[in-house]
Every structure is written in structure tokens, then in C-alpha cells.
């Protein structure tokens, strides 16, 4: 492990800095790159010229630099650090700046970590927080000594927060988000500021993100492989345009008359799938461990729940304990692929969602994370225009996307656009796919010795785990299984939804796993994930796809050691 380093601060350095600052025009701001380390206070006002940034900008500046005292305790402890805030100016004067934060610990481990965003971005990630699905019993990245940074991807969200797509009316802002240009700009500025603070560049640089942040991780290592030693991508929205179109098909299905199931009906569907499929992995524990078999055999039209038919009598909507034919039809649409044969990115379909056994928003569950699950799933209201604030997350997302990124008409009826046959909008959607759907060529990253960890919950109804499988399978077809496993791993987690789950709320020390692979050549095998909500403290193996966890027939059902990863 690299030695921990504290910035040098002798009086001679202060004198040299003063000479450096006075060496040019009185009106010229000081450069971020200096020969000796800067104090936190001296970081304020530093600038980075445009020619030091790998993509076009008009330069960057530090708007604030504040020393933050230590706080917290145990794994959640945050050491003393310099919190730097700044802006990267656009080329287009009408475009928004990229805002970023950079946490620089006083005692540095000589490594850097970039955090990805979420949804449509628009806010800066918490640079003193954890990685996606990070462990609760291990130090935070800042606590490990990392210099941690992230940006809002080049626009500032309004009241809709991560669902605000209005930035798409500006081409530069849209490109910063879609193609990941903001990632490169932010990274280059951060590296120079880290060098200014410590007098050297990082020995190692990693990227971690989930959802949109997972897509950003994959984009970063694909477009700029030389910049990164390793990356962690949780539930990545990798084929962004495909994910949006598949999600929009789901939204349109739920918008059909009588198709949206209320929370009680969603709970009935969940119970029916669990009662049908739970034991497929060898133990009935509330987790569907063999999701593929469940997908193959479960049919809501014929399934039972608590011994009674899940389908309402005659298919009519007769109450909260059953699903009508309209609701069953919508669920089956969500389960099936969306055909997309017109995209210039080369993607041809969205594979559908593992809806059978997924928590799509169960309001009787009183856990700390359930409000997040409900918000990210079907929420409280059916999709309709104008889109309700409590509509499904994906419905608000796709409504915004279509209005501001595709048609650029805020008054457009988004539900009228058929994602499989978009008519006049096909060319625009196809064009957007060329930047939003992350490329699959990771040969440059593999050649430079980079390492990639991917993971996805099998009950994610926002970003489909089937899409991550498709990405992995494409990589296998391009590089061969042996070539891919030389630098990448993909794990699946039964019971885990998108970023949160009351069934199995997965945590994993992915950062240590990545560090050990990159820095110690410790090749990762099966991993252990710990539940913090469903049964707090229970563990399961994280099986490398295509394996799944099967109970061995004896032993503690809440211990990973009682399960084997099998094909």
C-alpha cells in the first residue's frame, strides 16, 4: 500500500509560494500547478487553464477551500480534510458550468477516487460518503485516506432533482452528460488540484458509481482507459438510451386503463412469486435465489397467492388481493423485451425486467429503506399527463427525457411516443443513442492492466439486471471468456433492488476487493454480501454470473457458508 502523506508546510514553502504568486501580472490568477504543496487556504482561488484539460473548456477555478474538522466514529469516521469546491467553465457561454467537489484528507494514501452520479445527475455526489452499496463495517473512502471527487456532470438540477432533464435544451450540457465529457474534464482538473495540494499526482486512480454512476464508470474506462487503474460499476445503466426506451415501454404499459396495480395488489404479486419460487434455491427464506427458474415457470395468470388464484375472478378488478387481466398484461409487458432495431449505437433491444418477485413498492413494509424502494419503483400514482410527482420514477424520468432531450418541446405528450416505433423521432433517438449507450470495447482498459468489478441486484425494476448480463455477454463474445476474466468480474445479488431493498439490502466491500486485485494481484473469487435490512447481518455469496447461490441442505440459512454457487 502506498505510504500515507501529509502536505509539507515549512515556512520556506510559504515564501516560495509567495514568490510564485507575485511572479506574473497582478491581474492573473495563480495557476493550480505549483512546485510545492499548498495549504488548504492557499487552494482557494486557484485556476486550471483550458489547455491543461483534455476536452474543450474555458478553464476551471476553485471557488472555495475549507478545512473540515474530523467527525464521526468507527467506520463512519471522517478525518480532517480540505473540502475544495470549484467550477469548470463551458465553451458555450449559455451552457452551465460543471460544478465539482474534491475532498483532500490531511493524511493522504496517495490514491484518488471519483464518484459517479445518479439519475439525470445535476447534483455533486457526497465526496465524504461511501461507494455504492458500500460496507458499513469498513472505513469510508475518505477515512481510508483517498482524495475523493465528483461533479454534477455539467448542469444544476431544479426542484425535480435527479429527474430534471431541462439541461438537454443546451447541446454542450447534453453532451457533458450523455457522452461523459464532464467525467474527463472533472478528472483532469481534480488531478491537477491534487498535485497542487500534495506536490504529486496519485499513484492509483479508481472510479466507483451506481446506476447512472455505473454507466459513467464504464464510459470513463472505455473512453479514457489510461486515466484509470480500476472501476466499480453497481447496477449500471450502461446502455442508457436502451434503458430509457425499455423504461418508457414499462411506463406506457402502466398508463393503460386499469393497468396500474395499487400497493396492495403489488404486495399480492410479490407474495405469489415468492411462494412459487422461494424454494427453488433449496431453502424458503424470503429470497428468490434462482431467479432464472422463476422467470421460466411463474405465470400470474395461473399462479396462486395464499392458496387462492392471483388472477381476479373473470379477469375483472374485484379487489386488492388479486390482479385484473389489464394489470397482468402490464406486468407481462414489463417482463418481455422491447425491440429497438433502429438505433445507430448498434443496440437492438431492451431485455425486460425480472418483475416476478421484485418489490415494486410495498407500503406495508416499515423499514428505513422502503420509502426509497417505493420512490424508485412504482410509487403511488399511475403515469398520466401532466405527470404526477408521485408517479413511478421511471415514468417521470422518461417523460422529462422525451420532452427535453428528444423533442425539445416541454409541452410534448411523452406517452404518445412508442419506443418500438417512434416515427418521426427515430432519427433523433438514434443519434442520441450513439453517445448515451456506452461502447463495449474495453480492450484499451484491459491492455493497460485495468480491473473492473460489476454487480447488479436481480430484482432491480429501474435498471434491468438483464441489461448488465447482455453487456457482459457482449464482452465475452468480443474478448473471449478467459480474456474478459483476466480483468473483469460480474456478480449478481438475489433479492436486491435498485440501490435499496427491504428483502436483502446488499453491502459489499468492493473497494478493498478492487484494491487487492490492482495493488496486490489478488484475483477475486466469490464475494460475500451482507444484508443490513431484511435480516440484518445475514450473509450470502455473491456468485459470479452465470452461477447462482444454492443452499447446501444444512447449516445456518443466514450464513454465506451454507450456500454454494452453482450453474
Describe the role of every protein-language-model region.
Residues 209-219:
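Glycine-rich nucleophile elbow surrounding the catalytic serine of serine-hydrolase chemistry
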Residues 219-221, 226-341:
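A catalytic-pocket lid/entrance helix-loop region that shapes and gates access to the active site
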Residues 487-501, 533-534:
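Histidine-bearing beta->alpha loop at or near hydrolase active sites
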Residues 200-211:
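Alpha/beta-hydrolase fold nucleophile elbow
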Residues 119-199, 245-246, 408-426, 431-434, ...:
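Cap/lid segment of the alpha/beta-hydrolase catalytic domain
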Residues 454-456:
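Short beta-strand/loop motif that positions the catalytic acidic residue
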Residues 18-21:
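C-terminal motif of bacterial Sec signal peptides marking the signal peptidase cleavage site
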Residues 25-111, 124-129, 134-136, 284-288, ...:
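Catalytic-loop region of hydrolases
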Amino acid at each position: 500500500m502506498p505510504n500515507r502523506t501529509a502536505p509539507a508546510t515549512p515556512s520556506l514553502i510559504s515564501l516560495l509560494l509567495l514568490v510564485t504568486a507575485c511572479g506574473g501580472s497582478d491581474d492573473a490568477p495563480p495557476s493550480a500547478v505549483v512546485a510545492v504543496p499548498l495549504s488548504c487556504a492557499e487552494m482557494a482561488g486557484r485556476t486550471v487553464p483550458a489547455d491543461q484539460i483534455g476536452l474543450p473548456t474555458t478553464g476551471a477555478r476553485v471557488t472555495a477551500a475549507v478545512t473540515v474538522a474530523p467527525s464521526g466514529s468507527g467506520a463512519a469516521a471522517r478525518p480532517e480534510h480540505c473540502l475544495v469546491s470549484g467550477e469548470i467553465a463551458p465553451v458555450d457561454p449559455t451552457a452551465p458550468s460543471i460544478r465539482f467537489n474534491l475532498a483532500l484528507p490531511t493524511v493522504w494514501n496517495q490514491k484518488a477516487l471519483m464518484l459517479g452520479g445518479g439519475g439525470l445527475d445535476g447534483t455533486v455526489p457526497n465526496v465524504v460518503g461511501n461507494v455504492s452499496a458500500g460496507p458499513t463495517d469498513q472505513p469510508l473512502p475518505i477515512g481510508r485516506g483517498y482524495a475523493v471527487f465528483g461533479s454534477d456532470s455539467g448542469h444544476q438540477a431544479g426542484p425535480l432533482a435527479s429527474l430534471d432533464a431541462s439541461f438537454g435544451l443546451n447541446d454542450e450540457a447534453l453532451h457533458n452528460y450523455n457522452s461523459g465529457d464532464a467525467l474527463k474534464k472533472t478528472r483532469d482538473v481534480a488531478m491537477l488540484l491534487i498535485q497542487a495540494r500534495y506536490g504529486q499526482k496519485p499513484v492509483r486512480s479508481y472510479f466507483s458509481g451506481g446506476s447512472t454512476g455505473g454507466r459513467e464508470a464504464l464510459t470513463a474506462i472505455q473512453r479514457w482507459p489510461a486515466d484509470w487503474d480500476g472501476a466499480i460499476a453497481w447496477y449500471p445503466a450502461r446502455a442508457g438510451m436502451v434503458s430509457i426506451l425499455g423504461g418508457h415501454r414499462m411506463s406506457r404499459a402502466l398508463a393503460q386503463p386499469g393497468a396500474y396495480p395499487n400497493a396492495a395488489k403489488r404486495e399480492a404479486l410479490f407474495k405469489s412469486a415468492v411462494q412459487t419460487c422461494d424454494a427453488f434455491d433449496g431453502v424458503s427464506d424470503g429470497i428468490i435465489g434462482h431467479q432464472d427458474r422463476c422467470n421460466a415457470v411463474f405465470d400470474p395468470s395461473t399462479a396462486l397467492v395464499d392458496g387462492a388464484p392471483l388472477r381476479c375472478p373473470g379477469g375483472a378488478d374485484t379487489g386488492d388481493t388479486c390482479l385484473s387481466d389489464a394489470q397482468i398484461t402490464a406486468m407481462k409487458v414489463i417482463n418481455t423485451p422491447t425491440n429497438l432495431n433502429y438505433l445507430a449505437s448498434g443496440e437492438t433491444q431492451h431485455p425486460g425486467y425480472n418483475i416476478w418477485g421484485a418489490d415494486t413498492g410495498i407500503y406495508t413494509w416499515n423499514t428505513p429503506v422502503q420509502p426509497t424502494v417505493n420512490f424508485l419503483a412504482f410509487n403511488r400514482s399511475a403515469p398520466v399527463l401532466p405527470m404526477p410527482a408521485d408517479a413511478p420514477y421511471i415514468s417521470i424520468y422518461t417523460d422529462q427525457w422525451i420532452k427535453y432531450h428528444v423533442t425539445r418541446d416541454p409541452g410534448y405528450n411523452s406517452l404518445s411516443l412508442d419506443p418500438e416505433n417512434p416515427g418521426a423521432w427515430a432519427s433523433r433517438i438514434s443519434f442520441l443513442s450513439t453517445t448515451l449507450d456506452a461502447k463495449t470495447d474495453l480492450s484499451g482498459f484491459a491492455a493497460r492492466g485495468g480491473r473492473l468489478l460489476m454487480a447488479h441486484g436481480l430484482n432491480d425494476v429501474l435498471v434491468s439486471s438483464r441489461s448488465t448480463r447482455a453487456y457482459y455477454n457482449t464482452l465475452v463474445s468480443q474478448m473471449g471468456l478467459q480474456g474478459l476474466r483476466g480483468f473483469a468480474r460480474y456478480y449478481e445479488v438475489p433479492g436486491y433492488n435498485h440501490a435499496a431493498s427491504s428483502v436483502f439490502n446488499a453491502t459489499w466491500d468492493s473497494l478493498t476487493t478492487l484494491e487487492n486485485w490492482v495493488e496486490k494481484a489478488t484475483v477475486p473469487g466469490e464475494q460475500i454480501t451482507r444484508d443490513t435490512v431484511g435480516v440484518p447481518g445475514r450473509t450470502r455469496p455473491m456468485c459470479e454470473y452465470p452461477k447462482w447461490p444454492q443452499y447446501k441442505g444444512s447449516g445456518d440459512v443466514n450464513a454465506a457458508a451454507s450456500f454454494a454457487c452453482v450453474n
